[in-house]
Curated annotation (Swiss-Prot):
Protein name from the UniProt record: Fructose-1,6-bisphosphatase class 1
A GO cellular component entry from the record: cytosol
Family: Belongs to the FBPase class 1 family.
Cofactor dependency: Mg(2+)
GO terms of biological process kind: fructose 1,6-bisphosphate metabolic process; fructose 6-phosphate metabolic process; fructose metabolic process; gluconeogenesis
Co-factor remark: Binds 2 magnesium ions per subunit.
Subcellular location: Cytoplasm
Organism the protein comes from: Yersinia pestis
């Protein structure tokens, strides 16, 4: 049995220039995940369920657990000294860490502390998403938004933690995707899936079909394609949509499938956040042999202009994403209604 800590140190030895700072940073994320895991498991017994009465910069109601997870991760990252600051879906602006080694720290972290938190009241899987970049601004100076507004190709590490029937941490540093399952009796994450790859073909599609009338024509046509009978392509595909990006992505990664959150008239740029959700998941998908686009363009090539920028998102088994892109290219004329 190999723990996450042992695995990271082992991989660090493959690089003579490694300083151990990224290893320490991942250890902080691991600690934050353990704390969130603990409190999610007793969420119905203590007063951390439901809305907080506060809205974020997008005007969305923040759940109590959103704020709890944000504060715990922020504290864990600040305490280590390897992080100059963070950007979070739950924060209006970047958070600059002061004191200690922060001004000379190499890295910045972007995160969605608790994805799918609206599901927590009904005991549905939720997750934490994180993305790590090297800072751009000079050492010894405060970081700025410039350090965070980098394309996804610049990510050093990305990953997520899914809190479900078991808690699992999945991450990549650009050398494959690896997954670790949490053993609460030992308090450690143990390697359970090494070098995870998407199956060559997929048979699941994940999209909120309740919004079908609002979708662009190409997306509607692709959904109908997924539902048609065809033995050669093993259609119809199975529809599976949890409403938690991490949970839907995780299932499709292991089983083969596509996750879609397209543009609509009410959300012409899509609804998912490019920096906190799309980029880290796109990095993981590509490292696992999958594909991630906005329907036309590679997600990781998009140069962000603002912290809370949104994007349409198509991610999963490469052939399925390419099929969806084909329908979008073939039926481009009808705008989302």
């Amino acid at each position: 049995m190999k723990t996450l800590g042992e695995f990271i140190v082992e991989k660090q030895l493959d690089f003579s220039h490694a300083t151990g700072e990224l290893t320490a940073l991942l250890s902080a994320i691991k600690l934050g995940a353990k704390i969130i895991h603990r409190d999610i498991n007793k969420a119905g017994l203590v007063d951390i369920l439901g809305a907080s009465g506060v809205s974020n910069i997008q005007g969305e109601d923040q759940m109590k657990l959103d704020l709890f997870a944000n504060e715990k991760l922020k504290a864990a990252l600040k305490a280590r000294g390897e992080v100059a600051g963070i950007a979070s879906e739950e924060e209006d602006d970047i958070v600059i860490f002061d004191g200690g080694r922060a001004e000379n720290a190499k890295y910045v972290v972007l995160m969605d502390p608790l994805d799918g938190s609206s599901n927590i009241d009904v005991n549905v899987s939720v997750g934490t998403i994180f993305s790590i970049y090297r800072r751009i601004t000079p050492f010894g100076t405060p970081i700025t938004e410039e350090d965070f507004l980098q394309p996804g190709t610049k990510q050093v590490t990305a990953g997520y933690v899914v809190y479900g029937s078991s808690t699992m941490l999945v991450y990549t540093t650009g050398y494959g995707v690896h997954a670790f399952t949490y053993d609460p009796s030992l308090g450690v994450f143990c390697l359970s899936h090494e070098k995870v790859r998407y199956p060559a073909t997929g048979c699941m599609y994940s999209i909120n079909e309740g919004n079908y009338i609002k979708f662009p024509l190409g997306v509607k046509k692709y959904i109908k394609y997924c539902q048609e009978q065809d033995e050669a392509t093993k259609r119809p595909y199975t529809s599976r949509y949890i409403g938690s990006l991490v949970a839907d992505f995780h299932r499709n990664l292991l089983k083969g499938g596509i996750y879609i959150y397209p543009s609509t008239a009410s959300h012409p740029q899509g609804k998912l956040r490019l920096l906190y959700e799309c980029n880290p998941m796109a990095f993981l998908a590509e490292q696992a042999g999958g594909k991630a686009t906005d329907g036309v363009n590679r997600i990781l090539d998009i140069v962000p202009e603002k912290l809370h920028q949104r994007a349409p998102f198509f991610v999963g088994t490469k052939s399925m994403v390419e099929d969806a892109e084909g329908f979008i290219a073939k039926f481009p004329d009808e705008e989302a209604k």
